[in-house]
């Protein structure tokens, strides 16, 4: 099912499959969101839950209060992105989707939960709020959540990928960890200098020749994708997320993904117990945790 929100600036669409954003068009009909061309990547803006990235061998180990250690299988980016969400509510400027675990999810993730995703259209901005409720009455629930929106790049016909830059809200000097595409894991100790006293990064396909770029030490809480020719662009604000992942495929795809994540793939030096992973969010019984990010069209 497709749902549409519209105001004087934007027309935005969503679908119940994955509970995700599927289109952002301005008043001139220019599409900003990647449209899932399978030649390059058939995704658009999947929701990553209850993990971001990969676990070691896809296994999560739990230390729950009511049983011995337990191992569950959770594949890359979690299990909700290809599931059907329930459409809870639609009004003039917002839409709410929700999902609860099925039997297969509970076999591998030991917690009853409800994930609600609230999208709000306000002017030229779309806010995505993730509301994660722990439905357990006694167990604290660990989780990670992330967004994976991909944007057309170039946005305008006649422009090239290399005509675009990323602009950070702060001057940045940071390194990035080594990644292992074959396993999805990271080595947080083996790092390569990436940004050196700069606020912008010119895009080039060579950036993604190895893998995604994990920015886990950014000071900036927003990043802007902008054409140096037409000025067309958008901004992603991610105050609630400590990490930003930059990604495109290695075959010169006409998109870039700007991904706020609450956690990272498993690193070589950490263990497999989900509750002990760095940056894990823990929700008390019957409590709700909320995280949000914004996409703003700039023209």
UniProtKB/Swiss-Prot annotation:
PANTHER family: APOSPORY-ASSOCIATED PROTEIN C-RELATED, GLUCOSE-6-PHOSPHATE 1-EPIMERASE. This is Protein LacX, chromosomal. Pfam families: Aldose_epim (PF01263). InterPro entries: Aldose_1/G6P_1-epimerase (IPR008183), Gal_mutarotase_sf_dom (IPR011013), GH-type_carb-bd (IPR014718), LacX (IPR037481). It comes from Lactococcus lactis subsp. lactis. It comes from the Bacteria. Signal peptide: none annotated. GO terms for biological process: carbohydrate metabolic process. GO terms for molecular function: carbohydrate binding; isomerase activity.
